[in-house]
Amino acid sequence: DGRPRTSPRGGSASGKRFQKEPQHNAASHSTYNQEEGYVRIYLRGRPVTNYLPSDVEDYDINAKHPAPTEKLKLDWVYGYRGRDCRCNLYLLPTGEIVYFMAAVVILYNVEEQNQRHYMGHNDDVKSIAVHPDSVTIATGQVAGHDAAEGKPHVRIWSSITLETLHVIGLGFFDRAVCSLSFSKVNVGVNLAAVDESNEHVLSLWDWKKEKKICDTKSSQDPVLACEFHPMNDEQIITLGKGHIHFWNTAGGKLVKKSGIFEKYDKPKFMLSLAFTGNGDVITGDSNGNMYIWGKGNTRISQAVLGAHEGGIFSLCVMNDGQILSGGGKDKKVVLWTADYQQSETTQVPEATGPVRTLCKGKGENFYVGTTRNAILSGDMGGDFTTLVQAHTEELWGLALHPTQGMFLTCGYDKNVILWDFEQHTQRWNKFMEDGCQSAGFHPSGEVVAIGMTSGRWVALDVESGDLYTVHTDGKEQHDIIRYSPNGEYLAVASHDNYIYIYSVKETGRKYSKVGRCSGHSSFVTHIDWSADSTKLQSNSGDYELLFWDAETCKQIVGSKETRDIEWATFTGVLGYPVCGIWPEGSDGTDVNTTARSGNGNILATGDDFGKISLFRYPVNHPKADCNSFKGHSSHVTSVAFNEDSTKLISTGGRDMSCMQWSVV
């Protein structure tokens, strides 16, 4: 897909449960055996046999399978990308704050509690700039999955209509666009961009004409910021690892002068910059020093040494000329007078992490984006409100409450979060001892089970998040954890190829082991319970579809016994009702997750390319048509419908995001 993706668990897997092998076309080899009553598809060369229910008559394998009428509309994005991006939080005159997560740019009106979304990108957004008109916005993205459209580029769009106005740089940028800035004086006709190629190429564009004016190699080292001077359109400043460069753009060329540190310590990283009202440049660095570079000068005219303990990740000049600085290590926000005297100090909360970026709000208020993917609003009084907070590492665990408007997510960051559908807020957030992989609510809605990456699993009280019980099965992650519909059994499907079965008493407060289902030759990827709570079906990493008796933990073989089982849920990727979900050229690992809607009309799937697709259920013809929706940038790890099938929640793996959609 154009860029190496490294697994968070080491190795260069695609950051997910499955290793990629040579591709094999799933759909084109499908066959139908009328006598035996099965459809056979091939995944990576392996036959997968799907038995038809006995009441299916006149089955035609070549019949068209139309897409459903239902579509998805994005309602809410949980999360903000502060962990590895910077300068990515702005306040618009509409009262909306604008920032990004995954492939979505979010315009969030805090007062009215609503979000709008710019959906033009097809992979991770890495950079953003707001035009001097405060309406036009430029956003830059990484190299994507799609060979044709997936090249890194910049999209320029209206924050009022959300229409795309211009697309620039397709085929020019390398890897990703990491920094953007509009010119300020000449009504913002120019746009500067830095990419993540080895040379970190700086380019200058006439964005309305979609024309490049000039470009140059800026630095072998990472570039962390790029800004036009607000009083001089012929000057651009870039800074990063071990450097600050002052660029002159006169005559359509980019000419570089490096900043000279003279008697001052040259820091390992220049981290942040801002401009004062008189045109001086202020920089913050990894040593915690603030340097002031006189207007039009490449030498330090003044220094504030030890302004922070550790790096200064952000600088922001307020409307009255005072300066805010935000610290990484010390988590402090410091207010400085216009002549660099320390005026006030406050600290952001420990739980939300260090300052990544600062943005001025109304009056004396300001917004803080943090390295733990949170956004806060507050003032120097230290009274901070958390507006956005979600996960900070890869995310797989998702469960929807059976009766109330709540859902739960859990991830490798060890956080378990219970969310409110309507309010888009956290009911509680519990920090566990191990990374979390999976979750499932007891049908009573009073208890939720969490599967860990360590082989442990726990049961928590839904109301309070308090721990009821801890169990250990094997030493590997528990990929799925699911209660039977009657609440009397719990199945724990593990990466060690086993499914552990427990009997459940006292609505999920007491557990005793029944046994384990042994028979898979690879790790278990999906499980579903039968409607009568007596049987299970399971998928594995090498495309086995097996059936089990819950009471005895014995495998059920023979198509007659299994073809007519009614399943309480359908979340697997193998079987007759889903044999058409595999796209042309699929290798069997592309689809990570499925969910049948409560009304049984549609099936949602989440794939490796950030797409959520809706199919008409059952998806019983190869190459079925579907409606697909983008928003996630990494593999979609989980999808789930609420009880009345009006909403869908999706989680992205490495994009760390969680999205709430309306089914329309």
Swiss-Prot record:
GO molecular function, one term: microtubule binding
Subcellular location: Cytoplasm, Cytoskeleton
Cited SMART domains: WD40 (SM00320)
InterPro entries hit by this protein: Beta-prop_EML-like_2nd, Beta-prop_EML_1st, HELP, Quino_amine_DH_bsu, Quinoprotein_ADH-like_sf, WD40/YVTN_repeat-like_dom_sf, WD40_rpt, WD_repeat_EMAP
SUPFAM superfamilies found in the cross-reference section: Quinoprotein alcohol dehydrogenase-like (SSF50998), YVTN repeat-like/Quinoprotein amine dehydrogenase (SSF50969)
Function: May modify the assembly dynamics of microtubules, such that microtubules are slightly longer, but more dynamic.
Protein name, as recorded: 77 kDa echinoderm microtubule-associated protein
